[in-house]
UniProtKB/Swiss-Prot annotation:
SUPFAM superfamilies: GatB/YqeY motif, Glutamine synthetase/guanido kinase. It holds the Pfam family GatB_Yqey. This is Glutamyl-tRNA(Gln) amidotransferase subunit B, mitochondrial. Residues 1-55 form a transit peptide. It catalyses: L-glutamyl-tRNA(Gln) + L-glutamine + ATP + H2O = L-glutaminyl-tRNA(Gln) + L-glutamate + ADP + phosphate + H(+). Belongs to the GatB/GatE family. GatB subfamily.
Length: 601
């Protein structure tokens, strides 16, 4: 049955049309159809696009990637040029304040524990919460790690020091003031030396000495945790935890050197057992003071740490990583330069930094001495430090990292700085002790060998301790344990390698077996596993070399005619593949190849 709208059309001109869009669909007719009325442009017409013509502005992917890479390189080059121009015109000055938690069992002015693993608000004394009538009791034991830190930083210990109150109101400080040593700290006039291997900026040369203005003891504040929109939780376990505040002189002029300074000071504090943790676990925080002035301009009105002619400084608080120190200084330097170049004035203020940001943000106006209302603490007597105590602590200080690196890089060990530095820093010196034991044992085992060969044993041992054994530890993702591969075992393995009883690949295989738990002595393990090297005769080497040469005559001609000696390594590899595993020695294979290829030109 025809639909009503179709019945109204004559048969000859009937067409199927969509009732929604009313577009006719012509059917076959026996007589000519009348012309259809023009279609309204208001109705969409669908058509199939079959052309493959590309848009004229379309760029092939590979070309686009190249253009993007060039643009990035150009931006970096422009940034470097701008920074270079900025360095020539403007001088950056940075001073650092480092707050480090001391390694003590009790708090600074109470007997409450400093444990960081207990439940929140479980280690709190009445004085920590500023209960009325509670009095501070200075804990003598907290002074010892503070003194070790100051001595390691080459400071002068003051025979008499005093405590002061620094007044401010904030929720993490129940008393309304912090006890510190502003006027008479216990240590002054120290320094820290930074070297190129510490990561200082190239423009700072090979070494930089940064002065330490003072080191003072003070209280830590409560730990706060924010729950938006309006809730904050406070853990008072941290209140009155002993801190040392280390204040450097404003003698740093590059962001990289500032980060290197914080890193070096943390390393020094850890090496003398003055602190429990570093920046990575929140045990050390840094504030940086940043100022800008035109290079060569000494007419500035601001003075910090006895150095005058500086620009107005801003302070960036609570930086918790070395990268944050460097990035925050760069951002603040650029901000101050932009302000000055636009004719503005840099305001003295406290600013904050968020990891991953490119700009610092204002927190509050900068407080001065008057704002904090420093005053002597009437409840604490002066602190007297005896010269005998200082002398005893100085005698028992561990060797500094700089001295250890100098020793390892010197004639006794001959290590490159790149190996000496991690040996000193890894596992708080445990890796260094292990390495020195391996070297001593190896030298004893090799005492019957050529003195010239013995001279390089320390470097060989360094490579095995850092690279080969270190690689196994990194792959296992486990904490260092010297008993896993005892020093005598590693020394015996290297001895077998030096005597050419085994090849390098075999030595690595055996080390992996020992690391996995094989406790057999090295000689027994090599014998039972049939891993001892059975040297090939000259005739066997020649046979292997001739077989390898026959594989690629064209490369042989390149070596002979163009002296491309680097391609000999390919033939050495072929000989090692064709020969019995572990028996082909690369140096001997190379020598035979040179005879057959070069001497027969």
């Amino acid at each position: 049955m025809l639909r009503p709208w179709l019945r109204q059309c004559p048969r000859a001109t009937r067409s199927l049309a969509c009732p929604q869009c009313h577009l006719p669909r012509p059917q076959t007719a026996r007589r000519a159809l009348r012309p259809l009325p023009a279609l309204s442009l208001s109705h969409p017409i669908r058509s199939l696009q079959t052309t493959t013509t590309e848009s004229p502005d379309r760029i092939p992917l590979r070309k686009q990637l190249k253009q993007d890479a060039k643009a990035v390189k150009a931006r970096k080059r422009q940034t470097r040029e701008n920074e270079e121009a900025s360095r020539e015109k403007w001088e950056l000055t940075v001073g650092i304040e480092i707050h480090a938690q001391l390694n003590t069992e009790s708090k600074l002015f109470s007997r409450a524990s400093t444990s960081s693993t207990d439940l929140p608000n479980s280690n709190v004394a009445l004085f920590d919460l500023a209960f009325p009538g509670s009095q501070p009791e200075f804990q003598i034991a907290t002074l010892l790690p503070a003194l070790r830190a100051a001595l390691a930083l080459n400071c002068e210990i003051q025979p008499v020091s005093k405590f002061d109150r620094k007044h401010y109101f904030y929720q993490d400080q129940p008393a309304g003031y912090q006890i510190t040593q502003y006027y008479e700290p216990f240590a002054k006039n120290g320094y820290v030396d930074l070297f190129r291997h510490d990561g200082i900026a190239p423009e700072d040369g090979d070494t930089v000495r940064i002065g330490i203005k003072q080191v003072q003891m003070e209280q830590d504040t409560a730990k706060s945790q924010e729950y938006p929109p309006s809730t904050q939780l406070l853990d008072f376990n941290r209140v009155s935890h002993p801190l040392v505040e280390i204040i450097t002189m404003p003698q740093i002029h590059t962001p990289a050197t500032a980060a290197a300074c914080v890193r070096k000071i943390q390393s020094i504090l850890q090496s003398c057992n003055a602190v429990t943790t570093g920046m990575e676990l929140g045990g050390l925080r840094a504030d940086v003071n940043v100022s800008i002035r035109q290079r060569g301009d000494t007419a500035g009105t601001h003075q910090y740490g006895g150095i005058g002619g500086l620009g107005q400084r801003t302070e960036i608080k609570n930086l918790s990583s070395f990268k944050a120190v460097e990035d925050a200084i760069i951002a603040e330097k650029n901000r101050q330069i932009a302000v000055l170049e636009s004719g503005g004035v840099v305001e003295g203020e406290t600013r904050g930094w968020t990891i991953g940001s490119t700009e610092t943000r204002k927190l509050r106006g900068k407080e001065g001495e008057v704002d904090y209302r420093y005053m002597p603490d009437p409840d604490l007597p002066p602190l007297y430090i005896g010269a005998d105590l200082v002398a005893a602590l100085r005698t028992n200080l561990p060797t500094s990292s700089d001295a250890l690196i100098e020793l390892l890089a010197g004639p006794e060990y001959g290590l490159p700085i790149e190996d000496a530095k991690p040996l000193v820093e890894l596992e708080d010196g445990a890796r260094l002790e292990y390495y020195q034991e391996v070297v001593d044992l190896l030298r004893a085992l090799q005492s019957d060998q050529d003195p010239k060969a013995q001279k390089g044993l320390a470097r060989v041992a360094g490579n095995w301790v850092l690279x080969e054994l270190g690689g196994l530890w990194a792959k296992a993702e486990e904490a260092w344990d010297a008993a896993r591969v005892p020093a005598p075992t590693l020394a015996a393995l290297i001895d077998q390698l030096q005597r050419k009883h085994i090849t390098g690949p075999t030595a690595k295989q055996v080390l992996a077996m020992v690391f996995a738990g094989d406790e057999r002595p090295i000689p027994q393990l090599l014998e039972e596993e049939n891993l001892l090297l059975r040297p090939l005769s000259r005739e066997e080497y020649v046979t292997l070399a001739e077989a390898a040469i026959s594989l690629n005559p064209a490369m042989v001609e390149q070596i002979r005619q163009k002296n491309q000696l680097g391609k000999l390594g390919w033939f050495v590899g072929q000989m090692m593949r064709m020969g019995e595993k572990g028996r082909v020695e690369a140096p001997r294979a190379d020598a035979i190849l040179r005879e057959l290829i070069l001497d027969q030109r």
